């Protein structure tokens, strides 16, 4: 197919669909680094015009990465649902954008087509959309998953509680865990990024989280975010594992660099499901992704980083995960230079994931050497929450002391819930009310020093005596 567009007296020609996609992408440092970005704003607009006129069916006939060379491409093509695609098969990319923004694109209609939308189709239409378009369309996509609670219902935003510690110290983790629970965080998952890769340490962390969840009957799930093969070994040794985690990418070579294949993920999912630890559902997988991972592994095949990211969602979709999130600014300014680029990428990732039927959240974050700050994260958080993001990640004080990057704090997540009227997962919401942590109106309450959660976790891990304030030492939201 010939890809071209004329602006004024200049005719712009593009050699392939892959080139059109890359040049049409909003400016970002990773694509400049890869040498695939537009040379000018005019060229970028011409590529968008050419892309808008491209039939969606083209993506089924012209693979950006050859079928013979890449397992992810084979997965995308072989798993494509022609019946789900039929209602939109006659559309161009531009027509698809118009339909997504129309009243015809109801939640039911979007759910019906999700298995017919390939990652490249999702990425392509996102390149034609303003930020507000990404928000409007994503908000209409409803994706619900279940393990010990129900995640993704309308009007709700879950929070991953991330109690990391640089030495995996049990007392430090417990203090962060207590802090997060007192702010109403943790309904998405209580997930630790361990500093150690020792199997004994990993299993001990799993046991500690399981003990806390069981002792206080918390309707949530835990996860220790180590390599998938270590988690399989932990299951074999009888560890109380809830969710299997793995970082994934959008090309076979990227996943090879992570030490993972589809066969390994198949094995891990089967092992986790065999434990039957879910009480309201059996979505047992948790994935993380991020724009730039393919280029950092020299595995992008000349494809722009946002399209590579969307292709990772095809891998995730195979496993019907409980959770998936983009760690949007974590990889650094080499790939997303500043707050503007991070905000745009976060909205793109959320839209593409939701359009493809994934329960996608976001680690709203940045590294300390990026041209970004907490004001940018405030903006992205509010935009994503408005767009119906499934969950966000929160750490004490927004500063992850183990991974050394800046994320959201527990009170940031509480702020977003408060100003937009969002609630936690329903089972977790009831638990917060029953425990006296939250009121019927959702506001966080001040608790007494003898509160069973404060006293229990403090005694369990020999923490200092609680003083009656929320665990972070500041005044609890909703307190007089």
Indicate residue ranges for each PLM-predicted region.
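Anaerobic metallocofactor- and corrinoid-dependent redox/one-carbon enzyme cores
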Residues: 2-174, 182, 189-467, 477
